[in-house]
Amino acid sequence: MLSGILIAALLMTLWGGWQPDIAHASDEFDALRIKWATLLTGGPALDPADSDIAARTDKLAQDANDYWEDMDLSSSRTYIWYALRGNGTSDNVNAVYERLRTMALAATTVGSSLYGNADLKEDILDALDWLYVNSYNSTRSRSAYNWWHWQLGIPMSLNDIAVLLYDDISAARMATYMDTIDYFTPSIGLTGANRAWQAIVVGVRAVIVKDAVKLAAARNGLSGTGIFPYATGGDGFYADGSFVQHTTFAYTGGYGSSVLETTANLMYLLSGSTWSVSDPNQSNVWQWIYEAYRPLLYKGAMMDMVRGREISRSYAQDHAVGHGIVASIVRLAQFAPAPHAAAFKQIAKRVIQEDTFSSFYGDVSTDTIRLAKAIVDDPSIAPAAAPNLYKQYAAMDRAVLQRPGFALGLALYSTRISSYESINSENGRGWYTGAGATYLYNQDLAQYSEDYWPTVDAYRIPGTTVASGTPIASGTGTSSWTGGVSLAGQYGASGMDLSYGAYNLSARKSWFMFDDEIVALGSGISSTAGIPIETVVDNRKLNGAGDNAWTANGAALSTGLGVAQTLTGVNWVHLAGNTADGSDIGYYFPGGATLQTKREARTGTWKQINNRPATPSTAVTRNYETMWIDHGTNPSGASYGYVLLPNKTSAQVGAYAADPAIEIVVNTSGVQSVKEKTLGLVGANFWTDTTQTADLITSNKKASVMTREIADERLEASVSDPTQANNGTIAIELARSAEGYSADPGITVTQLAPTIKFTVNVNGAKGKSFHASFQLGEDTSGPVDPGEPELPSVIVDNADSAGVTRTGTWKTASTQTDRYGANYLHDDNAGKGTKSVTFTPNLPIAGSYEVYLMWPAHFNREDAVQVDVGHASGTTRTAVDQRSGGGVWHSIGTYEFLAGSGGSVTIRNDALGSPDGYVVADAVKFVAVG
């Protein structure tokens, strides 16, 4: 207990004597404060007649009224709420401030039944006074129990209350509250999400007390580690879109979403003011949306594989979190540069409209409802197209495949990234959520919501290979071989060298992601722990009755709950989904398999996986179908292979099994490879530093490789070092011959015939995929050195000191990584028809040259960029679509050129596409073809 003398001193500070140096005249600080209040409440223009706003304000008022009724208002109270007694426990104190913030919102939000209630305001202020004396003051330790509450959580709530009730708080009271915040959070010095929270605490407080120096410090704090600058290690956003927090955990949808929200709000607050953000690295924030969030949002849900321990929070299930991220995108759209603002609005509109499971408006603030409805109701804003992509997140050991109608997330770990996080009594059963886990999303939008995590069998997470019924400890792995390769941003291969030391379990696991199928392979599965080893094919939440139809090899299986079966000779399985269409799943087992299955009702509580005080302990029950392959006890060199076929009917799965589009090329502990015959794709993961071959691909080092052969005319190849530990090169040989090629920097082509040979310099590449494209041709000449002078090639880059002429103002950027060289030019989507960039090569000989362009692609680009090729016979105009195909060379035809600098390629910014978009000028390549 505080002494009487100390209490008296605190009360004197609160009520008497010292007068704060706070100006009361209307000024820029007042405008910023009112802007923040509007962000919190929606402002005076809020339309209470809108049904979604009314529902939100009604709930706000109901929650506030419930809290108010339960308050202890007595003069002798020893707590504010009995359920949150314990005035030194930071968890409880933080929760008290959060409740008071809700009450302050209800008292200041138009349409709330408690709007303007003077008694409510007075009781809130009395509670703040009591808390100052008993719980939150400068005599407290800054880090007791949980530092986050004292230094970040409580100050954020108190700042908001101070803004909302600003006109009701005396100068003395205000100064006391603000001084306390300054005691706990005087400056900004952390990383990632914690830094963003520090910045918002310091910044909003600075607005309240009118401190220009602190407000500038808050703004500048965004330029520090883990926010604006891309990370190259540790916490923060990476150039590939990854987000890491606590050094080794994938957290895009957890701490990353907090960075996004907090950064967006602070940038919005300061936009248009004296303290507007001017750091050029703020442009990285726009890229977060395209690279980090767009691929990981599925019809309103944020993928759980990047939410860390937050998946164990009952109030933060995937759609609620996804809605919060979309709210941040809506916020960014209010002040981002015009082309980004337009793109953000399109993305937000699509996600809001696609989520038929959970209303976006039910999870966001009244101000966000107001802003989002202005977007959704605007017929001139077209929703963005659904993502159709494959993306490798090398910096956080994740991969995602998105197709119209389904998506698959893959969560891995390594020596760099940990398997799962479980701290602060959260995520107690997260054991296998990042250990080769597959997350399949389809039209069953409730699959990972509605109590999935407290009821799913945590020992049997889909995709994993485990020692039956045993947990694993959190931490990084013992192997660096985790990662994969992306081909053309559409297809990919991933793998993980798995090792659970506690169970002497090792395995090599690969996933090959094509168009509408995902192939999973496992090899070298061995253990000496005396425990059955199994690979989990799926663990799918069923409908409320648990009677989803399913078949094996076309024969109906029992749908009764509590039924366990051993199915032998299984070639294919079909499981009906939970919706009328778009949620069925097929499973194909090449060569047949023995499958263990169990259909059961599972009961659990959120409290069992999250033991924090406010977590509900009510039992919930859900039904599941689990399928796994039993490798037996102490297996040695066991293997498996299966194919996931999302959204296929039983007839379609049966037809696929009869004539599969895939072929397993090899599945050993040395190399795993699959061919997709209809697409001309071959993927291969090479596990050792020995020369090995899979189909047409030979590699001398550990590597992930994918190729695509198109109509016997072109061969595309992508290569990565998934170990991120090779400080040299990977030598690749492809059993084809070629006549010409284009390749990323870092690739050296040494031979085109009779086979293609090239090396990839992966030193410092951090798992990046390197791309090359080969023009196929007959082997008629024996070994061909592509560097011979009779086949010269010349590249002119926008950054070259000679050979590049600009007309009009072009901006230089380097934010996108699918570029050639250090940077590229863009027209700022302005001055259409008045700008151009001309690339003039110095060609060593006259003759025919195939001309290629490279550009960093984005869906806000022009889709019909006008290109003039000046050649020996005149000028030819063509057009390219810069919305896709980034980072690779695109042929625009073959032309005759004279030797020297008489030829040219001019990229124009004429506005001929629909809609108009950015035009970029990056690099041009001239390759002699005869």
Curated annotation (Swiss-Prot):
Xanthan binds at residues 146-148, 246, 255, 309, 313-315, 424, 612. GO terms for molecular function: calcium ion binding; D-mannose binding; xanthan lyase activity. Changing residue 255 to F: Loss of activity by 50%. Pfam families: Golvesin_C, Lyase_8, Lyase_8_C, Lyase_8_N. Changing residue 313 to A: Reduced catalytic activity. Its main location: secreted. The active site is at 255 (proton donor/acceptor). Optimum pH is 5.5 (in the presence of sodium acetate). Active between pH 6.5 and 9. GO terms for biological process: polysaccharide metabolic process. SUPFAM superfamilies: Chondroitin AC/alginate lyase, Galactose mutarotase-like, Hyaluronate lyase-like, C-terminal domain. It catalyses: Eliminative cleavage of the terminal beta-D-mannosyl-(1->4)-beta-D-glucuronosyl linkage of the side-chain of the polysaccharide xanthan, leaving a 4-deoxy-alpha-L-threo-hex-4-enuronosyl group at the terminus of the side-chain. It is an enzyme of class 4 (lyase). It is found in: Secreted. Keywords: Calcium, Lyase, Metal-binding, Secreted, Signal. Plays a role in xanthan depolymerization pathway by cleaving the linkage between the terminal mannosyl and glucuronyl residues of the side chain of xanthan to liberate pyruvylated mannose. Is highly specific for pyruvylated side-chains of xanthan and is not effective with hyaluronate, chondroitin A, gellan, heparin or pectin. This is Xanthan lyase.
